[in-house]
Amino acid sequence: MFLGEDYLLTNRAAVRLFNEVKDLPIVDPHNHLDAKDIVENKPWSDIWEVEGATDHYVWELMRRCGISEEYITGSRSNKEKWLALAKVFPRFVGNPTYEWIHLDLWRRFNIKKVISEETAEEIWEETKKKLPEMTPQKLLRDMKVEILCTTDDPVSTLEHHRKAKEVVEGVTILPTWRPDRAMNVDKEGWKEYVEKMGERYGEDTSTLEGFLSALWKSHEHFKEHGCVASDHALLEPSVYYVDENRARAVHEKAFSGEKLTQDEINDYKAFMMIQFGKMNQETNWVTQLHIGALRDYRDSLFKTLGPDSGGDISTNFLRIAEGLRYFLNEFDGKLKIVLYVLDPTHLPTIATIARAFPNVYVGAPWWFNDSPFGMEMHLKYLASVDLLYNLAGMVTDSRKLLSFGSRTEMFRRVLSNVVGEMVEKGQIPIKEARELVKHVSYDGPKSLFFR
């Protein structure tokens, strides 16, 4: 039965295990929500605004179905966009987006209809009637979200995180420090960003010393607002020792507008990653590394819509073990590090790294891997090579508040089924299975990130 009680649960032990974890609170250490939207607490106007307006998963699949861009990110009305989505939605079967959006519809709206061209109008009208009462803060409480960490630039004032402590009840909203723009000396706009950091923190960032001082001040500012982790997007990690004089020369050259060599770019990035590690060591933050996303791969999309619009891909030609070796050994026993990989063929590398370094953790199945298939493969492999007990928990990685419940439910069902299979095969006792699914679903990530 579609989305029935046994959805994704194929054995009796799995049903029992899921029933024990399904109502646990949600702790999400990595997502892309905007704290401003939560603080302002404005209800959504329609189902497209909730499900499609910010979700590049939806955009990509609509494009795959031949839908014109004007019905995705263009000038068409939200209703026209929803109707266009519903028309092709049956083609989404097998993709987790099909299940997530139906779970949203069934669990949050209590509308148990299958999305199609025939039901699109009814769903539009029914959701429109219910949305005025479904504010962001109410939804977070209804979904039992206990803690969530947004992803924020070091230049941010964090004013909405500060306000959230005053006006948001029952949910803790924390920032995450993401200094990618500081490190990416090869990207357009780097100098302007460095100058902005100088203005924000009162430092002369034309010098390396001034820039590092601004970053330290930013780090402290985030700490004061409850930050517990940093996050770093790395296509291919390449961290090694770089002398500060070398980094200073590259910084000054880049700031003056001169073109850098690839070696200079690599050296600067390696140097900065070590500085970020030292900062996190001071505050005992968790360091999250998201590895392997080749971003903005489709040029025409990036030129017209910018980043995070559905033009990113996965690639497996990465030297992860070699690139991380210096960083991991430099901070061995000094940092908690969580590794996420986009290509599943890299899972053996990070799982065995975690096995070798007690303070390294394998992150949740990420992005293209957060489907039932990807999750099952991820969990089974991790259990067989490292410790499933030590998985860094589930992250929604979402830009869409409504999906917190559906993404978490899917993960907990898959987890329960994987562990339930072990019980049914006689591999583990039910008592240990119960403790395992509870730890991975809630206790483990809460302890790792939020102590």
From Swiss-Prot:
Gene3D superfamilies cross-referenced by the UniProt entry: Metal-dependent hydrolases, uronate isomerase, domain 2, chain A
Catalytic activity: D-glucuronate = D-fructuronate; aldehydo-D-galacturonate = keto-D-tagaturonate
UniProt-listed Enzyme Commission number(s): 5.3.1.12
Name of the protein: Uronate isomerase
Pathway(s): Carbohydrate metabolism; pentose and glucuronate interconversion
UniProt keywords, alphabetically: Isomerase
Superkingdom field: Bacteria
Pfam families found in the cross-reference section: UxaC
Organism expressing this protein natively: Thermotoga sp. (strain RQ2)
NCBIfam families membership: PRK02925.1
One Gene Ontology term of the molecular function aspect: glucuronate isomerase activity
GO biological process: D-galacturonate catabolic process; D-glucuronate catabolic process
Family to which the UniProt record says this protein belongs: Belongs to the metallo-dependent hydrolases superfamily. Uronate isomerase family.
